[in-house]
């Protein structure tokens, strides 16, 4: 028999963006909130806004990798990338970016909030249940005013709103290169064009669903 010796080749390096101190704090604080709120699930992500690097990512419920078979299979699900939810008022920052870029508003644009607004047959109220009255654009952001953001969304219109949804990557995986990443759920543009209520609710963070990583 002949023998052939093949010299080993050094493997490639794998460098994580995770910061172990930030990861430890994130895990600790998420567990604390998860227990206090008696939540069914929770996720937290810490990102470097300059580079997009993920400094920490945690999900609850979780499991011990050394004894994974002693935990429900569902505990191995990474809710930070696997699950979609309505983002709520955090989406107002995205809507703000759209409107400022398109110059449909500026910091001093005026809005009036009587506490609710009628869109088609639906009535949309502000979360605090009270009227904010006359506000600048900066103030509707500060107050997270639903009525104000309904108007911002409607002023943008379907075409421009969807242009930016696509540009921001909503409705598609981010490409984080982790298994099982969901793409979220976006109302079809053709559907949104049929009634103002779709755009009105999207502008304040409802109707569409996103993943925490998005």
Where are the regions a protein language model picked out?
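Conserved, well-ordered alpha-helix/loop/beta-strand core segments that scaffold catalytic motifs
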Residues: 2-42
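Beta-lactam-recognizing serine transpeptidase/beta-lactamase-like catalytic domain environment
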Residues: 2-5, 18, 44, 49-89, ...
